[in-house]
């Protein structure tokens, strides 16, 4: 029930469960060797094209909006497989997303329509990578799974803590090891991670992936 285990690598626990410890050991060794080789072949000059592009395409902050939320609490609600058409949509006369409607239609709300799906095989983890770092996912597999454990990131939680003293927490209803979140969130600078083990996940409190 878990296709593409070796290409997308949802969770290392799944690899051991479905393929066995021996297969996982070989797989993990090969991935480690590949990553080490990539690091040894890397050169700082590889970044020149990236730096040049970002400098040429730099967008100045909008002065009327820059800093308007300084020192405010930041709450990010990340919805899985959600689409814009459900906002203000009614089914049988009832709003499908009443709470989101109240946020979207608020007088102090800014809404952005020039916003597109850019995820690859990493799916949800790619979306989280872009949200926190502005970086795209990998051509194959998940950045969370392949590179998230051994790297640190210029990520929003760390930047906000270093520059403005913010404390941070992330809440997710799945296992912490799924998409390697338990390791990646630390390297993003999150100070607290509350996964499924912190919730009462009986049938009354669950609906598919929702808690």
Indicate residue ranges for each PLM-predicted region.
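Short glycine- and Lys/Arg-enriched binding-loop motifs that mark or flank ligand-binding interfaces
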Residues: 77, 130, 185
């Amino acid at each position: 029930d878990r296709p593409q285990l070796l290409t997308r690598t949802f969770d290392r626990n799944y690899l051991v469960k479905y393929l066995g410890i021996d297969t996982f050991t070989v797989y993990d060794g090969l991935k480690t060797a590949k990553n080490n080789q990539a690091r040894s072949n890397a050169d700082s000059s590889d970044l020149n094209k990236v730096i040049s592009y970002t400098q040429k395409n730099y967008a100045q902050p909008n002065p009327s909006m820059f800093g308007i939320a300084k020192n405010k609490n930041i709450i990010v609600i990340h919805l899985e497989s959600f689409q814009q058409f459900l906002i203000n949509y009614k089914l049988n006369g009832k709003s499908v997303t009443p709470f989101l409607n109240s946020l979207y239609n608020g007088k102090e709300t800014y809404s952005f329509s020039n916003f597109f799906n850019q995820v690859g095989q990493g799916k949800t983890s790619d979306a989280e990578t872009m949200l926190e770092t502005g970086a795209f996912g990998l051509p194959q597999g998940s950045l969370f799974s392949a590179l998230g454990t051994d790297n640190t990131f210029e990520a929003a939680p760390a930047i906000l803590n270093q520059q403005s003293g913010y404390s941070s927490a992330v809440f997710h209803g799945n296992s912490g090891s799924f998409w390697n979140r338990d390791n990646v969130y630390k390297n993003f600078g999150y100070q607290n991670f509350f996964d499924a083990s912190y919730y009462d996940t009986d049938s009354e409190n669950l609906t598919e992936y929702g808690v």
